């Protein structure tokens, strides 16, 4: 089964390398979560959590454990390559057991590109601060010392409001320009 959190992470690494922008693990983890939120809100489908793993509220914000463990060896250094996954179900099948998770859905790629354009210039700590603000899913769910699950419905509700606010600002600006 495809790991969508890692597919999103790999897509952000691709975008970062294309734009010649360093991306470190902490920033990557935050961008993956933000993209997940917008995908839930805008595409109305659970791409990540429902398919393989759940988001957890860790000390420095929302985390998909697979993304953390796949990139933790970089520490605070820039990530230089995409991650790969070993698929145990393919052992003995004659198929390659190692693959690079990648997004297949164009709409999901578009959402990730939107997130990248709007958040790429924020550093790690700025993204952590944004995700720790009052009213965020992390703030609602975090319990110190526990990796509490952040339910998709909480994330979707929050990012639906964020998307609605963006839409209102765009409409207001369009009316001013008309």
Spans of features found by a protein language model:
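Domain-edge interaction signal
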Residues: 1-178
């Amino acid at each position: 089964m495809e790991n969508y959190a890692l597919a999103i992470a790999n897509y952000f690494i691709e975008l970062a390398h294309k734009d010649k922008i360093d991306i470190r693990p902490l920033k990557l983890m935050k961008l993956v979560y933000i993209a997940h939120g917008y995908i839930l809100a805008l595409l109305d489908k659970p791409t990540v959590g429902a398919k393989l793993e759940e988001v957890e509220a860790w000390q420095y914000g929302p985390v998909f454990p697979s993304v953390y463990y796949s990139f933790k060896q970089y520490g605070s250094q820039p990530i230089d390559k995409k991650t790969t996954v070993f698929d145990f179900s393919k052992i003995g099948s004659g198929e390659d057991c190692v693959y690079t998770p990648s997004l297949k859905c164009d709409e999901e790629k578009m959402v990730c590109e939107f997130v990248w354009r709007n958040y790429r210039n924020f550093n790690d700590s700025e993204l952590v601060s944004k995700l720790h603000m009052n009213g965020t899913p992390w703030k609602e769910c975090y319990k110190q010392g526990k990796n509490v699950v952040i339910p998709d419905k909480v994330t979707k509700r929050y990012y639906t409001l964020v998307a609605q606010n963006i839409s209102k600002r765009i409409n207001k600006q369009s009316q001013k320009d008309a």
